[in-house]
Amino acid sequence: MELLFLGTGAGIPAKTRNVTSVALKLLEERRSVWLFDCGEATQHQILHTSIKPRKIEKIFITHLHGDHVYGLPGLVSSRSFQGGEGPLTVYGPQGIKTFLETALDVSGTHVTYPLVIKEIGEGTVFEDDQFIVTARSVSHGIPAFGYRVQEKDVPGALDAEALKEIGVSPGPVYQKLKNGETVTLEDGRTIHGADFIGPPKKGRIVAFSGDTRPCENVKRLAEKADVLIHEATFAKGDRELAGDYYHSTSEQAAETAREACAKKLILTHISARYQGENVLELVDEAKAIFPDTVAAFDFYEHEIKRT
């Protein structure tokens, strides 16, 4: 599970930061990539990475401001010409279906793969045997959501060496034991799968704030998260301005991470007014409250390891 930041700027593209998009690479887990937001030129940013558009399985949109969605029609269209045959599901607030379908319709675009557009509310928006994705409303002046991606616990590994030591050779019986079944061997011995399975591996959690003022729902999304990705549009000296524009300061992002007991904070959605050393000041302001903080930059990668 890896994060790749395709765009980390705010509002409009800048020379050093494109507008918002984050890829959650789940290549080992499910051979796919999920995107969170898809600002203008996201597909161009992808060209500078190893991501293959055909591997993009899901796109989660936080809200419908242009710097988060203007890249969506182009990417959805281009995926048809880049080997995309598998289904693509787009999740977002009310209006995402009209926006995307209208853009594709008036441009005469016909995708060659199953495209599903789901307008979401609060609660579980996706769940399978591996992951559960939860959305909650955040404070941004228009309908907007943050997301929590929670990996389900992975069953422990079968202790093959211990089985060999008691004379149980690899074969179909291993799968039964791995499933936790009780097995009677040919020699009459009975063994229990639970005795040969290691402890489960804790699932990982990553939370996305989207654009928002500080609010309780972001804390709920980020509770005990391995990583919280939180917008930091303003420095702490502009706290009032941040509130007026429904954004957060880096200091407020850190306060949220601390109160949610997150393990790591990654700042993004950084205004073009902050360059070079000014970005370091944003990080320092956050670190004073939540030490394990970094500021993302375009193409920054972070592996979310199991703990």
UniProtKB/Swiss-Prot annotation:
Transmembrane stretches, start-end: none
Residue positions binding Zn(2+) 1: H63, H65, H140, D211
EC number: 3.1.26.11
Cofactor: Zn(2+)
Residues noted as binding Zn(2+) 2 in the record, renumbered to the chain: D67, H68, D211, H269
Matches recorded under CDD domains: RNaseZ_ZiPD-like_MBL-fold
Gene3D superfamilies listed in its UniProt record: Ribonuclease Z/Hydroxyacylglutathione hydrolase-like
Sample GO molecular function, one term: zinc ion binding
Catalytic reaction(s) noted: Endonucleolytic cleavage of RNA, removing extra 3' nucleotides from tRNA precursor, generating 3' termini of tRNAs. A 3'-hydroxy group is left at the tRNA terminus and a 5'-phosphoryl group is left at the trailer molecule
Location of the active site: D67
Keyword tags: Endonuclease, Hydrolase, Metal-binding, Nuclease, tRNA processing, Zinc
InterPro entries (alphabetical): Metallo-B-lactamas (IPR001279), RibonucZ/Hydroxyglut_hydro (IPR036866), RNase_Z/BN (IPR013471)
Broad enzyme group: hydrolase
Matches recorded under Pfam families: Lactamase_B_2
Entry's cofactor comment: Binds 2 Zn(2+) ions.
Family: Belongs to the RNase Z family.
Assembly mode: Homodimer.
Known role: Zinc phosphodiesterase, which displays some tRNA 3'-processing endonuclease activity. Probably involved in tRNA maturation, by removing a 3'-trailer from precursor tRNA.
The protein, known as: Ribonuclease Z
Species of provenance: Bacillus licheniformis (strain ATCC 14580 / DSM 13 / JCM 2505 / CCUG 7422 / NBRC 12200 / NCIMB 9375 / NCTC 10341 / NRRL NRS-1264 / Gibson 46)
Lineage per the UniProt record: Bacteria, Bacillati, Bacillota, Bacilli, Bacillales
Name of the gene: rnz
